[in-house]
């Protein structure tokens, strides 16, 4: 059984860390995905992230394979897989950037009180027994940032 998915939910400190961690996926020769999610916070970008990693993330035209190879041994030809030079966005048909700033939202989650009585729990849609179960509906309220 091999690793099918590697997810980074923050920036690795170095490009070598990224290479090592994403290299775990697909070692058995089967299809695998490596996903990197990050936000550009000043504190994140200022201290611990290497310049090569910053340059890679800022350049939407750089081939991922080329970057990884340049960090290892420097040998890579991007078009060796496709027969022509290509970027990540054209290879996989994805848009390489995310929307600027998503609006934050406050979510409330449903909660149910447990009742350890001998009677069965109330059935959905029935009016009897509804007082025994306290429900709060799930809602999402956008935060506008204005008061």
From Swiss-Prot:
* Compositionally biased spans, kind Low complexity: 125-141
Helicase C-terminal domain residues? 1-72
Q: Which residues cross the membrane?
A: none
For region Disordered, the annotated ranges are 100-147
Q: Which family does it belong to?
A: Belongs to the helicase family. RecQ subfamily.
Q: What does this protein do?
A: Truncated ATP-dependent 3'-5' DNA helicase.
What's the protein called, per UniProt? Truncated RecQ DNA helicase-like protein C212.06c
The species this protein belongs to is Schizosaccharomyces pombe (strain 972 / ATCC 24843)
